[in-house]
């Protein structure tokens, strides 16, 4: 929100001095779809007489993210004199690595934790509960952080694959170190990170020919470094598991399925078991069409609510697709899907060289919605700003 506020005067200056700014045809079309989602949300809460405006104001949220992305990319361009997809990606990697390290510091050092908790309000009371006790950074916790870590893992997967065919292959080890750090600590923060990990490794296997047993020699350095860094990661994890206080608990949470497989001979994850019970479908045609007007915990927003609420979720479900349906029906769900699809499609059209990366990001978003309702529009928003910057550079060169 603060970044969006900073972006407003920058936007005003750009419009006044250069007659350029944030609004173009693509942003306008995105706004239309976000507006449709908001209108459907408004209709649902009005028809159902509920006070839950979670997605009735989605167009405002979309513009907040766009303005924040505009601010970030503008400052990057000011510092470096240019803005590119790979430059932005490197910044995103640095931010996520710092968040992971900060999460460990907050968990390990009470003084740091006290300072962060004093000045940053991000639901620490819930995160610090004995039965929750989750790692968190600054604005990075639970599935919101997990979905963004997952997005970054597939972006790293694409960039490393691209490096294998260029002189930049010397940076592969550095990117892989960041990859494993985010994969491990990210899973300690939120196991949604696993989605990105699986898609990233699957992408590497597909691109390098591992699945067909015909490995492309261009990718030999990738797999060589991958195995070495994986081995080092396992050694460090085992050491920390046995000798660093509280690490055992964090690792067992992050990779519960693997521990269950080794100790019990079966893959079992408690959150997956809970997730199965959350696949609850609407029982009336009205709910399928326009929803019931509840997205947030109804006990917290509606003093007159007498319906079904389990575990803090309306109808007891945290599944993204189902929460959208229960909130504003299939129409609202379709509008939300189109917002993300259009954002990804515009990125593909503008930055066609990175087509695979944006397809992976779309896949991350739509797979995450089978688990939670968090979206990664912010990620697409920043790359839309990259495309806009490149378009401005071309126009400037044409004038010259």
What are these language model-derived features?
Residues 116, 126, 258-328:
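Long extracytoplasmic/lumenal interhelical loops at the membrane interface
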Residues 4-69, 98, 363-365:
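N-terminal hydrophobic segments of proteins, predominantly signal-anchor/transmembrane helices
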Residues 168, 202, 206, 210, ...:
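Hydrophobic transmembrane alpha-helices and their immediate junctions
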Residues 136-141, 308-344:
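A conserved mid-to-late transmembrane alpha helix and its immediate loop/hinge
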Residues 215-223, 229-233, 349-353, 383-400:
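A juxtamembrane structural motif centered on a specific transmembrane helix
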Residues 216-225, 237-276:
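Flexible juxtamembrane loops connecting transmembrane helices in multi-pass membrane enzymes
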Residues 154-158, 197-204, 357-400:
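Transmembrane alpha-helices of multi-pass inner-membrane enzymes
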Residues 89-117, 138-189, 193-210:
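Alpha-helical transmembrane segments of multi-pass inner-membrane proteins
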